[in-house]
């Protein structure tokens, strides 16, 4: 798929690949995948409770994906899901703010009609595209217990029993940076699944080790090899992202 990436840093939502923007690129995926990109600083609330019955109320568990690299603010809007009361501004709004310079993410108290949201809620905040391996959690300014773990390349922090009036602050280490792509691992995984001879796989693997991250050399060598356009393109995507 040919895409245009505006200026900035972009993250693939599903596989975690990190791209620098300001250019067009060809992105390669399997038949079961599509590229979905989030910009640095993106704040994306989600829930797994999507059945017909679930959507009649607001969820007591929310996952919030937060991407590293830039400041951003998001306001989560919720209403009663059934009536037209929202036309009279009968709603609940939860501000969420990422202060990347301070390495801090905040979920502020619910504004508006707090009765529209659960009396307590569990937030699972997933930090994507960051080098952080740990975090501290504060509820109303007091350090709180939270489950912190790495999950599928994300740093996941679960904060339970959050009341509508609570302020949740998650602080990452000061030295947290935007993560870097593991080019070798991604390229070797691609080769593992490529339908080519083992000799060709070995040649490409040796080239990757020999070039030691030198993009221009890798690109030139790949162009000179007798590879399919798709395989060459997929390798170049990983190398030049």
What are these regions (language model features)?
Residues 164-165, 172-241:
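Mature N-terminal, pre-catalytic/accessory segment of carbohydrate-active enzymes
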Residues 18, 34, 43-44, 50, ...:
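Weak global preference for isoleucine
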Residues 1-134, 140, 165:
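Catalytic core of carbohydrate-active enzymes
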Residues 96, 144-149:
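Short, surface-exposed loop motifs enriched in S/T, G, D/E and P with embedded aromatic residues
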Residues 142-144, 235:
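Sequence-structural signature of mature extracellular/luminal beta-sheet repeat domains
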Residues 147-169:
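A surface-exposed beta-strand-loop module
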């Amino acid at each position: 798929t040919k895409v245009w990436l505006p200026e900035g840093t972009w993250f693939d939502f599903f596989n975690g690949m990190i791209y620098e923007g300001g250019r067009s690129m060809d992105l390669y995926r399997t038949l079961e995948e599509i590229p979905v990109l989030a910009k640095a600083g993106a704040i994306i609330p989600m829930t797994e409770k999507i059945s017909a019955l679930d959507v009649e109320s607001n969820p007591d568990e929310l996952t919030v994906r937060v991407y590293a690299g830039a400041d951003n603010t998001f306001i989560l809007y919720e209403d009663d899901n059934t009536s037209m009361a929202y036309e009279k501004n009968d709603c609940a709004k939860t501000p969420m703010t990422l202060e990347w310079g301070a390495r801090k993410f905040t979920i502020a108290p619910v504004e508006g009609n707090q009765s529209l949201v659960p009396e307590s809620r569990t937030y699972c905040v997933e930090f994507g595209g960051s080098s952080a391996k740990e975090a501290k959690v504060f509820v109303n300014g007091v350090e709180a217990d939270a489950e912190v773990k790495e999950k599928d390349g994300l740093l996941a922090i679960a904060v339970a029993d959050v009341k509508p009036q609570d302020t949740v602050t998650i602080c990452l280490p000061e030295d947290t940076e935007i993560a870097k792509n593991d080019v070798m691992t991604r390229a070797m995984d691609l080769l593992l699944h490529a339908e080519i001879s083992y000799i060709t796989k070995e040649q490409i693997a040796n080239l990757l080790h020999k070039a030691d991250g030198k993009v221009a050399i890798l690109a030139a060598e790949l162009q000179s090899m007798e590879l399919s356009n798709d395989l060459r393109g997929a390798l170049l995507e990983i190398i030049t992202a």
